[in-house]
Amino acid sequence: MTDSDRLQQIAHLRREYTRGGLRRKDLPEDPLNLFEQWLDQAVAAGLPDPTAMSVATVDEHGQPYQRIVLLKHFDRRGMVFYTNLGSRKAQQLEKNPRISLLFPWHMLERQVMVLGSVERLSTLEVLKYFHSRPRDSQLGAWVSKQSSRISARGVLESKFLELKQKFMQGEIPLPSFWGGYRINIESMEFWQGGAHRLHDRFFYQREGDAWKIDRLAP
């Protein structure tokens, strides 16, 4: 297949956005209120993994990295996710706490972008969440040295069985290398698909205890 053939196969893939627009008069003053409304609608619509978000970080050379992570909590203090503290993203966040999140709710013709910086969660917060997870997920956190190179999947499976036997009785302890982050939100952008590619975009920028709202050109 030539490059021209491949281009022809994907260049026509598009659709019209017809689900409705977003108007300034309908926006709440706090973006988290709108985010909660949209997330509830994504759940009600049966979207797969509605809390899945693309998490973008950068390394010391300015190279961006992205991965899908699940949002686990949000409130006025920010948005929370958990991870292995030895992972690539955690190591990058330790050196540069700047972060970007993106929630892609394609079926609803919506997306939400979040910009901010992270802070580590307290051990108490992490412990409470860790013990709310399914037992096998707790074991999985112990097994994987995230982002490290391994020779085969069997290495993980053998370690899982070993730890399952080790922790058969009683509570599984919190690994010292497992934790979480809270994103201190500085701005949020809400995108709603529109007819003729005239999409609606609204940008919330934190100003002290309030939010400045601007409409952006699509």
From Swiss-Prot:
Reactions this protein catalyses: pyridoxamine 5'-phosphate + O2 + H2O = pyridoxal 5'-phosphate + H2O2 + NH4(+); pyridoxine 5'-phosphate + O2 = pyridoxal 5'-phosphate + H2O2
Binding site for substrate: 14-17, 72, 129, 133, 137, 197-199
Cofactors demanded by this protein: FMN
Family annotation (SUPFAM superfamilies): FMN-binding split barrel
Record's cofactor remark: Binds 1 FMN per subunit.
UniProt: FMN binding residues: 67-72, 82-83, 88-89, 111, 146-147, 191, 201
GO MF annotation, one: pyridoxamine phosphate oxidase activity
EC numbers on record: 1.4.3.5
Record's subunit section: Homodimer.
Pfam families cross-referenced by the UniProt entry: PNP_phzG_C (PF10590), PNPOx_N (PF01243)
Top-level taxon of the source organism: Bacteria
GO terms (BP aspect): pyridoxine biosynthetic process
Pathways per UniProt: Cofactor metabolism; pyridoxal 5'-phosphate salvage; pyridoxal 5'-phosphate from pyridoxamine 5'-phosphate: step 1/1; Cofactor metabolism; pyridoxal 5'-phosphate salvage; pyridoxal 5'-phosphate from pyridoxine 5'-phosphate: step 1/1
Similarity remark: Belongs to the pyridoxamine 5'-phosphate oxidase family.
Protein's UniProt keywords contain Oxidoreductase: yes
EC category: oxidoreductase
Entry-linked Gene3D superfamilies: Electron Transport, Fmn-binding Protein, Chain A (2.30.110.10)
Keyword annotations from UniProtKB, A to Z: Flavoprotein, FMN, Oxidoreductase, Pyridoxine biosynthesis
Function: Catalyzes the oxidation of either pyridoxine 5'-phosphate (PNP) or pyridoxamine 5'-phosphate (PMP) into pyridoxal 5'-phosphate (PLP).
Full protein name: Pyridoxine/pyridoxamine 5'-phosphate oxidase
Transmembrane regions listed in the UniProt entry: none
Matches recorded under PROSITE patterns: PYRIDOX_OXIDASE
Gene this chain is encoded by: pdxH
